[in-house]
From Swiss-Prot:
Origin superkingdom: Bacteria
Family of the protein in this entry: Belongs to the UPF0178 family.
Protein name (Swiss-Prot/TrEMBL): UPF0178 protein OB0454
SS bond partners: none
InterPro entries xrefs: UPF0178
Length: 146
């Protein structure tokens, strides 16, 4: 099992790195070159930089991931592809994407995009709370200790 992180806007990288290190699980952070950093991570963490294109990180994660790996993303499209590949997919707010909830999430995304295209404003995501971080930590631990 490996953990792949859609890392450009992931607010729980610290939790992922800490908890996976305790379990000796490899983590790959996939991020765009626009987020290049000299920050050093522990030896179980690899950072892969991709072009700044809209879905470049998603494509790279799908290229690397195998059935049974964990992917952390807030991107519903990537989540859908990863589920079809047999990966476990987690959102940083502490819920797992499943074959039971992904269609509703994709439909919601589509309707919001349709409203924005017609000139309406839609609400953005709520800010990450401490409760969200706790929920993610608990969920992540469940998956890496299976």
């Amino acid at each position: 099992m490996k953990v792949y992180v859609d890392a450009d806007a992931c607010p729980v990288k610290d939790i992922i790195i800490k908890e996976s290190g305790k379990q000796n699980i490899a983590v790959t952070l996939v991020t765009s070159l626009s987020h290049y950093s000299l920050h050093e991570h522990p030896s179980h963490v690899e950072t892969i930089y991709v072009d700044t294109g809209a879905d470049a990180a998603d494509y790279r994660i799908m290229q690397l991931a195998n059935k049974g790996d964990i992917i952390v993303t807030q991107d519903y499209g990537l989540a859908s592809l990863a589920l079809a590949k047999g990966c476990y997919v987690l959102h940083h707010k502490g819920f797992a994407y499943t074959n039971h909830n992904i269609d509703q999430l994709l439909q919601s995304r589509y309707l919001s995009a349709k409203e924005r295209k017609s000139g309406k404003r839609t609400k953005g995501p709520k800010a990450l709370t401490e409760e969200d971080r706790i929920n993610f930590n608990q969920l992540f631990l469940q998956y890496i200790t299976k």
